[in-house]
């Protein structure tokens, strides 16, 4: 801001000149005193310059509606929506989300620094405030087969970007606890630039939390219980209440929030598909859930705005007050969080459930390296899914938990055979992870329980965090067909039955993102999910998103990688038997 800009704002604030915009007849939520106030809102240069009586070049009549600060999603992977940042903005702005803190580690695991650059350049063209945390663990663990490796030196140039707020979720707790050199450098670089550091403490003990706090990690979004939340709060952390397409922890963690500690909590979605964003919303959905569960509405809206802003040092976000950015929501029903108008920097960007802005031309095109990321040299065959077993020895099985990222390690007696065949009666299916980045043929095979498929197979190139191809199926032929379809199309999601392709959603950008509109992807996902009953699927969870997390070897108890079964607590690969 220069001297002329400041003078203009001061003149408008003092009433010496008209404000650019004045909002009248609204009830303003004061998130500091937790009360409603009646006043005009004066806006100049996208910033609130006063609450009181003002005149403006433009006057907006709020018609008695409530005006609250724009919602902030404190931790989200935009790639999980399967659309670009420009399309993601179109999905969340009508729901009142005006700022997101995003970690592009999904695309970074596939395409490295080029993937991060693509996301930042795309974000600059969206009216949504998109701020970035730099991926700290690419790959998620040293043994993982990702498409890139990012060292501290690779991240340093990105700290010059004003959109970058810090270092994203530090999930390799072994590297932190043992003081691994490159991890120490990443942590120090973030603090030397005056940035924040995000945590990822899934299932970790209080002793590890002590280590993370000593490493200057300020928050955690992997909390699933009241007890975990309070333990982190007493050690000085912020805690996020998460509600995504798979991980749904808001109601379990909410009992930890009280009037004394509420300022240390805020909302996030983490991973949410675009169809869920369009139909259900984002942080607005969590506000509604929290109020319905008994949280005071003032606290719910504070969690949705001010608290996240304070955690990340966003001094001009999170409140309707002078000096704050005019990121405002018009709310017709506070308890239901019904957003009728969304303003970003004083500009109306969405009304009555639809965006109302013209997207600037010349969207940033991805590098060719982002469009050629499924590198299986040859099609897979049925023999690639052969799992030899020994009769009489128990098999280690992944037991998935619907709507949770965690799994259970289960031992199941081996059948009387020399090779495992899927057992749909007992819901024991084959799971495969095929490395797709190097061209080397490497396929991890295992057994999973909990999907409930009776026929066919599903597969996707979205498999956190290395994003190799992951598939689950009832027979080898359909597993091969599903994976080969992704090889041919450059990535996406697919469903196969009896050798027939039921439907496929192409994701050509890094095998993670569509080059189509949010609406197009939503419609295509709808067709895909309509086909799932043909496979016998009747679950109340998203099987593709659930499948995508079964390859993440930093969330307990047992996961599947391209190198085979991985015991997260022991932090080592284990045999099937």
UniProtKB/Swiss-Prot annotation:
Q: Which Pfam families match?
A: Adenine_deam_C, Amidohydro_1
InterPro entries recorded for this chain? Adenine_deam (IPR006679), Adenine_deam_C (IPR026912), Amidohydro-rel (IPR006680), Metal-dep_hydrolase_composite (IPR011059), Metal_Hydrolase (IPR032466)
Task: Name the cofactor(s).
Answer: Mn(2+)
Cite the EC number: 3.5.4.2
Q: Which GO terms label this protein's molecular function in UniProt?
A: adenine deaminase activity
Task: Name the Gene Ontology biological process terms.
Answer: adenine catabolic process
What the entry lists under SUPFAM superfamilies is as follows:
Composite domain of metallo-dependent hydrolases (SSF51338), Metallo-dependent hydrolases (SSF51556)
UniProtKB keywords: Hydrolase, Manganese
Catalytic reaction(s) noted? adenine + H2O + H(+) = hypoxanthine + NH4(+)
State the signal peptide span. none
Which family would the database say this protein is a member of?
A: Belongs to the metallo-dependent hydrolases superfamily. Adenine deaminase family.
PANTHER family associated with the record: ADENINE DEAMINASE, N-ACETYLGLUCOSAMINE-6-PHOSPHATE DEACETYLASE
Write down the HAMAP family for this protein, in alphabetical order: Adenine_deamin (MF_01518)
Query: What name is this protein filed under?
Result: Adenine deaminase
